[in-house]
UniProtKB/Swiss-Prot annotation:
Pathway the protein acts in: Cofactor biosynthesis; pyridoxal 5'-phosphate biosynthesis
Protein name: Pyridoxal 5'-phosphate synthase subunit PdxS
A Gene Ontology BP annotation from the UniProt entry: pyridoxal phosphate biosynthetic process
Organism (species): Bacillus velezensis (strain DSM 23117 / BGSC 10A6 / LMG 26770 / FZB42) (Bacillus amyloliquefaciens subsp. plantarum)
InterPro entries the record matches: Aldolase_TIM, PdxS/SNZ, PdxS/SNZ_N, RibuloseP-bd_barrel
NCBIfam families: PRK04180.1 (NF003215), pyridoxal 5'-phosphate synthase lyase subunit PdxS (TIGR00343)
Superkingdom, natural source: Bacteria
Entries under SUPFAM superfamilies matching the protein: Ribulose-phoshate binding barrel (SSF51366)
Active site: K81 (schiff-base intermediate with d-ribose 5-phosphate)
Keywords: Lyase, Pyridoxal phosphate, Schiff base
Family to which the UniProt record says this protein belongs: Belongs to the PdxS/SNZ family.
GO molecular function, one term: pyridoxal 5'-phosphate synthase (glutamine hydrolysing) activity
Residues involved in D-ribose 5-phosphate binding: D24, G153, G214, G235, S236
């Protein structure tokens, strides 16, 4: 019989990352840079989202050799991505002992109808969301941590801002509702009624919600924290910059001290050029990774 972790334990692991930065890395060297810069965790990948976007084709789980290399290189938690709905990729990563699995729209979905039943796993999961409906559906499936979808690999923060603001606005709306209005709101959002009741009672989501997708500068990271993010994922931004080590430290500092504008100004000096970035309106519908999943 497969073991499963309790929600309390899995969500507690996510709470421990609160206020921190999680960085995408593709090898042991990058993982060490991230750890030394103060990252609370790393995401082991074969290619960062910008390279996945540029290469096209089918993006799958990283080679286990890369994941193991990163796990052996650092003492901080290691996450890895599995395709949406790909049961075996997730089980393989769990068997390898990763600390967290990201059921990620950055990779090509394996199942366009069903997400993983994350309640059946011992390892905790993080999932992306654009609104409260997506957020609560993923939580009901067993996600222990959420993140904005943003638009990965673009270096453009606009979609992450949109998603964070939308989720938080919808949470505030639910909190202000009377109990007899909640069932209709659950129907409108496609959200489990019991979770909306819990959100109304607690005044917040039952799991942490990080910012992800388009964080490219220290100011971007600070912006997302001000908008209510519990922490920040940085994908392509750090290792696509001119000075990754300095850039990584600046992102971590800006995330921690997100209202210290003089410090953020100093952190932003002489970082070199940030990743070039992509204007969202130039993307074709099929290039929009955030549309993957439901």
């Amino acid at each position: 019989m497969a073991q499963t972790g309790t929600d309390r334990v899995k969500r507690g692991m996510a709470e421990m990352q609160k206020g921190g930065v999680i960085m995408d890395v593709v090898n042991a060297e990058q993982a060490k840079i991230a750890e030394e810069a103060g990252a609370v965790a790393v995401m082991a990948l074969e290619r960062v989202p910008a390279d996945i976007r540029a290469a096209g084709g089918v993006a799958r789980m990283a080679d286990p050799t890369i994941v193991e290399e990163v796990m052996n290189a650092v003492s901080i938690p290691v996450m890895a991505k599995a395709r949406i709905g790909h049961i075996v990729e997730a089980r393989v990563l769990e068997a390898m002992g990763v600390d967290y699995i990201d059921e990620s729209e950055v990779l090509t979905p394996a199942d366009e109808e069903f997400h993983l039943n994350k309640n059946e796993y011992t390892v905790p999961f993080v999932c992306g969301c654009r609104d409260l409906g997506e957020a609560t559906r993923r939580i009901a499936e067993g996600a222990s941590m959420l993140r904005t979808k943003g638009e990965p690999g673009t270096g453009n923060i606009v979609e992450a801002v949109r998603h964070m603001r939308k989720v938080n606005a919808q949470v505030r709306k639910v909190v202000a509702m009377s109990d007899d209005e909640l069932m209709t709101e659950a129907k409108n959002l496609g959200a489990p009624y019991e979770l909306l009741l819990q959100i109304k009672r607690d005044g917040k989501l039952p799991v942490v919600n990080f910012a992800a997708g388009g964080v490219a500068t220290p100011a971007d990271a600070a912006l997302m924290m001000q908008l209510g993010a519990d922490g920040v994922f940085v994908g392509s931004g750090i290792f696509k910059s001119d000075n990754p080590a300095k850039f990584a430290k600046a992102i971590v500092e800006a995330t921690t001290h997100y209202t210290d504008y003089k410090l953020i100004a100093e952190l932003s000096k002489e970082l070199g050029t940030a990743m070039k970035g992509i204007e969202i309106s130039n993307l074709l519908p099929e290039q929009r990774m955030q549309e993957r999943g439901w």
